[in-house]
Structure formats: C-alpha cells, structure tokens
C-alpha cells in the first residue's frame, strides 16, 4: 500500500484460511530503492519463534560438502525447526547469516537464491549478512539465525 505521507507497506499473505490475527508487513520507506532478496524491515504480531544459530549439518551432525550445500542444509534445518512450532516459511520476519568468507557468498549468489527459493519460496524477510573469523564448528562455512512470527 502506498500512502502519500507514509512508508510503503506490503501486506504478506501469512494467515492461512481459517487462521485469524494480523499479517506480517514488509516495511519499505517511501523513495528507497526496492531491495533484492530481502526486506528492509518487517512488522508482525503473534507468537514469536526464534532459532539458535543453525548450520548445514544433517541429523547425524555430518556437514554438507561445500558452501552452497551447507546453506541448502541450514535452510532446510530452519524450515524443520519452524515446523516444530507450527510456523511456515511465510512467517519468517528475520534471518541473520554468518559466513566465514564473504567472497564465497558473493560468488554463489545465483545458486544461493535457488536454494533459498526452493526452501522458502519468494518470501524475503529482513536479513543481515555478517562475515566472521570462524564458527564454533570449525568446518562450518555458514550459520543462520531465524525469527518467525506466527499470526494469532
């Protein structure tokens, strides 16, 4: 929704049929360029679901081979954690990515986008990307924290 005196608010279809409550809103200040692959901000009301730092390993704690594969597995792990709380990808309001090599991230944007959309569709919450020296699991290349809000 564009208003003459306020920010653009894009209402996301977060409430499924029969679900009640508010919907998440993408916050896009007037005049700002549209971001690609993330939102500048989100507003939502409901039950908050927060993950810890999620890395790209499977249930047997085996890390996927390579950066893109680790991202794919981490995103899948996040989807499973959200499902435990009854949350769906469209309930995501924030992702914080920690990577050990920013150049590796930037060199793989196309594949990362495909992996992201395969897991979460075209829903892009607020995101931050931070390069770190290393992660707790020495061979991990990426760790992602997620916050979701399930509408009431």
Provide a role label for each language-model segment.
Residues 1-93, 99-152:
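N-terminal presequence-like segments and the immediate start of the first folded domain
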């Amino acid at each position: 929704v564009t208003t003459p005196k306020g920010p653009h608010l894009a209402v996301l279809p977060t409430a499924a049929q029969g679900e009640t409550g508010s919907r998440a809103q993408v916050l896009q200040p007037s005049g700002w360029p549209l971001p690609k692959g993330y939102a500048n901000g989100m507003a939502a009301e409901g039950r908050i679901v927060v993950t810890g730092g999620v890395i790209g390993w499977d249930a047997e704690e085996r890390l996927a081979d390579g950066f893109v594969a680790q991202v794919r597995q981490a995103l899948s792990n996040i989807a499973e954690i959200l499902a435990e709380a009854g949350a769906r990808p469209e309930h995501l309001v924030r992702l914080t990515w920690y990577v050990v090599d920013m150049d590796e991230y930037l060199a793989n944007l196309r594949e990362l986008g495909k992996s992201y959309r395969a897991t979460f569709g075209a829903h892009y919450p607020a995101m931050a990307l931070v390069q770190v020296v290393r992660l707790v699991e020495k061979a991990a290349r990426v760790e992602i924290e997620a916050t979701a809000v399930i509408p009431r």
